[in-house]
Amino acid sequence: PINFIQSKNISFTNDFKNGLGPLGGVLTAMKWIKQNNRNYEWISTFPSDTPFFTKKELKYFYEKIRINEGKLFFIKSEDTRHNIFGLWSIKLMDQLETDLEKGERKVEVWADSIGVNTVNIDYKKPDPFFNINTKEDLKKAIEIMKND
């Protein structure tokens, strides 16, 4: 089990329903906001296995977003859309829940169906979207950090 640092500024919650994948996690966050009477209009999602994604990329992403132009924004680099690096309007909650009930599980397919805007980010090495999925990836990340 993972031991999390306790903080009054961080809330942890279990997915409201298991087996729904990343979209279920997004919906869980939206439901938590509603249930806890938060006045948030947006949530951000970022994978936790991308050690080279920095505040610089995050700041650029937020600066380029025009929230009156959409309800869902993802980051794009080169020709790749990064479907977990996102900003999601809480207004998508009912549609997301309906589509999950109908069996949709793929973030890319769902985002395409409702309409998604992208913000292109150019970057220098190391690749901020490099993610660690295997022991080999971890070794590579350690080497990148040593050489950076």
Which ranges hold each PLM region?
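Nucleotide and nucleotide-moiety/phosphate-recognizing core
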Residues: 1-104, 112-129, 135-136, 140-146
